Amino acid sequence: MALANTRPVSGSIQWTGTGVGKAHTGTLKVTQGSITMKGKDVVGGEFTMDMNTIDYKNAKLVGHLKSPDFFEVSKFPTAKFVTKSVTALKGDASGATHQISGDLTIRDQTHPIAFKVKISEAGDQLRAQGDIVIEDRTKYGIKYNSKKVFDVAKLGDKLIEDEIKLSLDVSTSK
């Protein structure tokens, strides 16, 4: 029986938030994390996002995202994902090789989430790439201009959709 070993990861996340007639896409750094291997199989992992690294071309928006209206970075400087299960996929139409299920914590609110990743090897690097969809940001206490919290008619073009899309790209040495 192969023993599990844990390897450190680094990487980044591209995020996209949308509102009426607009979309904003920026980045966020993965500052800590690990992938757990058993032989050649990925069996677990976790990663921490430094919310202070939220970046976008508009400094005013970045400041607002870091404020209590959104991520309240001064109080909640990190967000974290911890894997609960990893399932190998065969022949997935999207090209994904694994289904990952786990717990995502943002603003000290933890909820289960599942997403597909493509795990690939190149040289001495193991890389995981995938898209994560947070369907309801209000579950994490991010309620600013949400249609679930505020009157849509009053929000008008100030409405911000509740879905947040994240594109994960992390890697580790084999």
Roles of regions detected by a PLM:
Residues 1-174:
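Low-complexity, acidic/polar, glycine-enriched regions of mature
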